[in-house]
Structures are given as C-alpha cells and as structure tokens.
Amino acid sequence: NNLLVSYINQTGEEVFLDGFWSESKSWFVEGKSSAVLSEENPTETLSYVLQIGEGFVQKDLTFSYDSYEVVINTNLRGIKNDVLDGNFRLDWVGGLPLTEPSQDGMFLEGLVGQGGDIESFKAGSAGLFGSSSGAIERSAKQYTGPADFVGYRTKYFGVFFVPQKTDFVEIAKYSSDKRIAVDVITNQNINFEETTLYLGPLEYGEISNLGVGIEEKILGWQWLSSVSWLVYSIMIFMYGLIPNYGIVVVLFAILIKTVTYPLMAKQLRSSKKMQEINPLLNN
C-alpha cells in the first residue's frame, strides 16, 4: 500500500493509519466483485473506514474512465479532537518501479510547484551507462508555503499530488530493495479533504489536464521546449488523421527530410564545388 495517511496526536506522537481499512458500504452490484469503468459508467468511488478509538476516519478513492487521475477525499473530522493543529499527512511511499534501471536514474526528479515556479530536486544518481541505488544516501528536501503540486518522475512515468490546499510538502529519497525509492509527502488541514493523485505516463495531454504546469517539465530543457511543443503538436495532428503511431513516425521523418532537403542540397553542392577546386588550391 503506497498511499499512507498519518497525523500527530495531542501528545506529539505520529499516528500512522496503516491498519485494516474496511469498506464503509458495499459497492458490489448484483453480486459482482469488481467494477468496470466505461463511457456509460465513467466514475467509481471506493469508500473505506478505519476506527481510531471511538472515532472513525474515512478515505474515498474516485476513479475515472480513461484517466490516470484518482481523487482522494480524506475525512478525519471524526477524530479531530485527537489531531494536533488540525493537520494530517498524505504520503506516497516507495516511489515507482523502474522501467529501465540502467537509465531511469538519470531522469529521477522530484518536482514542486510553488507560486507559478517549478522547483526541482534531483532524486537519482546515475551516469550515462547505469545507475546504482547503493550510491543514494537518504536525504529529503522540504518546501514551506502553498504548493500547487508535489511529486516526482522517472523516465516515462510520474506520481503527483495536487492538493486542495497545503502549506508544507516534502520529497525524500533513499535506497530500498536494491533500487531507488522516493517518498512524496503533503501536509493538509482536515478542513481541506480533497487531493488529486496522478499516477501514470508522462503524456503531455494527460499531464496538462491537471492544470498546474507540470507539462512544462516534460518538454525537456527550456531552450528546447518550443521545438518539443512544435514536434508534439505536429505528431498529435497527424495521429488524429492516421491513428497509428508507427505510420505517423515514418511520415514525420519524411516530412522532416522534405523540409530540410533544400538546406542539405545546398550543403552538398557547396561540398562538391570545394572538391572541384581543391586540386587548383593544392597547385
């Protein structure tokens, strides 16, 4: 279970809500033990409760069809008298599996959005030819003040929290089971229960739907972002006409060659002229 809820009680002890969460109500319909999301059934909410003393904590997870977003509602009002300062923590623990261990370390990066700016925290330690979790020392970086999002990315995937409201976030990295692990932490008030969790590929359209600017980081270096955006836009347009990325890539390569041919032809002519006059220069 990567998703963890915790809080500080009135005696200053941290309480981790990692016990057995039971369903608050049965969502099974007509004896079915699962739900299938579709255009006819676009959302499904799973509700769980955990008893703490005489009170209850409720956690709702809302999944949407054709989306990598999960809306999390965490209700601690049933134990609010035990929660110090009315704040709780929502953590994503352990990070994501590495799809390419030899290269992912180069791309592991914690990201925090604050005031329209994106702060970066390098989580990996890798060279061009490999990565080593043993080289990772446990460290963390904390950010105070309102944050639009917090999370981290691998080469192809990302996990991000987009909280309703938070004044403190943290990213921690360490070695676990011979791989790099990353924890993402948000601190929230119990009156602001909703958090959006994005867990999926770094696909520009999906990321931009979050509306917090994460897509700016997946376009690469800033000086390349305009070119990356142009390439992305052209390929998406072509995919809309021909829904096959293999064919789109081939056609895009032909398009690039056609556009750059005049320049290449000019260079070839110049090179040929240099070869013709080279004997004269040597004489």
Protein language model features and the residues they cover:
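Soluble non-transmembrane domains of integral membrane proteins
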Residues: 1-217
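Short, hydrophobic/aromatic alpha-helical segments in well-folded domains
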Residues: 72-73, 234-237, 280-281
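Conserved hydrophobic/aromatic pocket- or pore-lining residues that grip, position, or stack substrates
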Residues: 188, 238, 257, 281
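Interfacial loop/helix-cap signal at membrane boundaries in integral membrane proteins
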Residues: 194, 198-248
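Membrane-interface amphipathic helices and adjacent TM-edge segments
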Residues: 259-283
